[in-house]
């Protein structure tokens, strides 16, 4: 099971959207992927993200590479993961 693959649901661990869940829509190169929330579900805008800023979960939806936000939203609703995607995760910042 590859951790970084199209359709994998991840948690953003860095940045202003830290703690929000997103879906990998496309793999750009070895370091970056294209993700979306979609924004109206989890608050994550469609954008390029460094893979070091993502924590993959065990959940995956079946979408095509480059799927639109509407297609992603439809698949999330079909899988019954809408409430799961809306949940925010509390990120623990290590203290020095």
From Swiss-Prot:
Family: Belongs to the eukaryotic ribosomal protein eL14 family.
InterPro entries hit by this protein: Rib_uL2_dom2 (IPR014722), Ribosomal_eL14 (IPR039660), Ribosomal_eL14_arc (IPR023651), Translation_prot_SH3-like_sf (IPR008991)
Alphabetical list of Gene3D superfamilies matching this protein: 2.30.30.30
Biological classification of the source: Archaea, Thermoproteota, Thermoprotei, Sulfolobales, Sulfolobaceae
Keyword match NAD: no
Entry keyword DNA-binding: no
GO molecular function: RNA binding; structural constituent of ribosome
Chain ranges passing through the membrane: none
Provenance organism: Saccharolobus islandicus (strain M.14.25 / Kamchatka #1)
Protein's name in the database: Large ribosomal subunit protein eL14
UniProt keywords, alphabetically: Ribonucleoprotein, Ribosomal protein
Disulfide bonds: none
Domain of life from the UniProt record: Archaea
A GO CC term assigned to this protein in UniProt: cytosolic large ribosomal subunit
Single biological process term from Gene Ontology: ribosomal large subunit biogenesis
């Amino acid at each position: 099971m590859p951790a970084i693959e199209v359709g994998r649901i991840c948690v953003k661990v860095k940045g202003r959207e830290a703690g929000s869940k997103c879906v990998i829509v496309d793999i750009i190169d070895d370091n970056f992927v294209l993700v979306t929330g979609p924004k109206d579900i989890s608050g994550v805008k469609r954008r390029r993200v460094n893979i070091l800023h993502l924590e993959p979960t065990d959940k995956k939806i079946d979408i095509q590479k480059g799927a639109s936000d509407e297609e992603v939203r439809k698949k999330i609703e079909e899988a019954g993961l809408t409430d799961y995607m809306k949940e925010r995760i509390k990120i623990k910042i290590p203290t020095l």
